[in-house]
Swiss-Prot record:
<dbReference type="GO" id="GO:0000082">
    <property type="term" value="P:G1/S transition of mitotic cell cycle"/>
</dbReference>
<dbReference type="InterPro" id="IPR011009">
    <property type="entry name" value="Kinase-like_dom_sf"/>
</dbReference>
<feature type="modified residue" description="Phosphotyrosine">
    <location>
        <position position="160"/>
    </location>
</feature>
<feature type="modified residue" description="Phosphotyrosine">
    <location>
        <position position="15"/>
    </location>
</feature>
<dbReference type="GO" id="GO:0007284">
    <property type="term" value="P:spermatogonial cell division"/>
</dbReference>
<dbReference type="Pfam" id="PF00069">
    <property type="entry name" value="Pkinase"/>
</dbReference>
<dbReference type="GO" id="GO:0106310">
    <property type="term" value="F:protein serine kinase activity"/>
</dbReference>
<dbReference type="InterPro" id="IPR000719">
    <property type="entry name" value="Prot_kinase_dom"/>
</dbReference>
<feature type="binding site">
    <location>
        <position position="33"/>
    </location>
    <ligand>
        <name>ATP</name>
    </ligand>
</feature>
<keyword id="KW-0418">Kinase</keyword>
<dbReference type="GO" id="GO:0007095">
    <property type="term" value="P:mitotic G2 DNA damage checkpoint signaling"/>
</dbReference>
<dbReference type="GO" id="GO:0032880">
    <property type="term" value="P:regulation of protein localization"/>
</dbReference>
<feature type="modified residue" description="Phosphothreonine">
    <location>
        <position position="14"/>
    </location>
</feature>
<dbReference type="GO" id="GO:0008353">
    <property type="term" value="F:RNA polymerase II CTD heptapeptide repeat kinase activity"/>
</dbReference>
<comment type="subunit">
    <text>Forms a stable but non-covalent complex with a regulatory subunit and with a cyclin. Component of the Frs-CycA-Cdk1 complex composed of Cdk1, CycA and Z600.</text>
</comment>
<dbReference type="GO" id="GO:0030174">
    <property type="term" value="P:regulation of DNA-templated DNA replication initiation"/>
</dbReference>
<dbReference type="InterPro" id="IPR017441">
    <property type="entry name" value="Protein_kinase_ATP_BS"/>
</dbReference>
């Protein structure tokens, strides 16, 4: 640890405090994620070991790089490359009447999806995608951070706990208690983020799990066996759910062109089996004519 110094606290991560720091040897500015260990007996928590092992495997230009792992007494520090801005802060910093440039939205969506495709091909889910853990720099690069809740998945997909994704970006199969889920949970989250970039407003701002579901149902209509076979058998599905019968999504997306709307509709398909894949997102007509170079924000 003597090679690093803390400069200031910059936030609370999933497992502990995050500091801006400096490498004393190179002068490089870094992000230091401190994970407190409960006691000396327990050693490094399995959650941290999982995060470390994942991040060391995931080397990609759109994934935050883990530089080093350090132990100090009953603490572990994860040393990451430092980016000072995240997508939420960036959107919040724009004037109220200003929308993100459409080319920047396309560029960010392409980069985020490229990172997630890279993960999905390695059998890794992120499971906690949200604007707060998408870090950006001035050159137009966006990187996915905080794989704290990511986990390698095998085939068949294991039964997971379902407390994972921040409420507003949480997939319906998770909210309805599905014991098995896979890559489509990340696609749903990206669809919500895409809509938020295009409109400056979160699409489904629920304040409880049931409120979150009802907000989805109001906009996308209440799912039925016809559009989502098996939905009524999910543990938290109730026959008493209100029945909204029209899809209002297009009304929420006034700033998007027809290809953009079509892509979001495919990302927000209720049935995970039919939700678009990361690979197919990148090949969608929304990206026709798009040069995958960076767009300055």
């Amino acid at each position: 640890m003597e090679d690093f110094e803390k400069i200031e606290k910059i936030g609370e991560g999933t497992y502990g405090v995050v500091y801006k720091g400096r490498n004393r040897l190179t002068g490089q500015i870094v992000a230091m994620k401190k994970i407190r260990l409960e006691s000396d007996d327990e050693g490094v928590p399995s959650t941290a070991i999982r995060e470390i092992s994942l991040l060391k495997e995931l080397k990609h230009e759109n994934i935050v790089c883990l530089e080093d792992v350090l132990m100090e007494e009953n603490r572990i520090y994860l040393i990451f490359e430092f980016l000072s801005m995240d997508l939420k802060k960036y959107m919040d910093s724009l004037p109220v009447d200003k929308h993100m440039e459409s080319e920047l939205v396309r560029s960010y969506l392409y980069q985020i999806t490229s990172a997630i495709l890279f993960c999905h091909r390695r059998r890794v889910l992120h499971r906690d995608l949200k604007p707060q853990n998408l870090l950006i720099d001035k050159s137009g690069l966006i990187k996915v951070a905080d794989f704290g809740l990511g986990r390698s998945f095998g085939i068949p997909v294991r039964i997971y706990t379902h407390e994972i994704v921040t409420l507003w970006y949480r997939a319906p199969e998770v909210l309805l208690g599905s014991p098995r889920y896979s890559c489509p949970v990340d696609i749903w989250s990206i669809g919500c983020i895409f809509a938020e970039m295009a409109t400056r407003k979160p699409l489904f701002q629920g304040d409880s799990e049931i409120d979150q579901l009802f907000r989805m149902f109001r906009i996308l209509k209440t799912p039925t066996e016809d559009i989502w076979p098996g939905v009524t058998s999910l543990p938290d599905y109730k026959n008493t759910f209100p029945c909204w019968s029209t899809n209002q999504l297009t009304n929420q997306l006034k700033n998007l062109d027809a290809n953009g709307i079509d892509l979001i509709q495919k990302m927000l398909i209720y049935d995970p089996v039919h939700r678009i894949s990361a690979k197919d997102i990148l090949e969608h007509p929304y990206f026709n004519g798009f040069q995958s170079g960076l767009v300055r924000n």
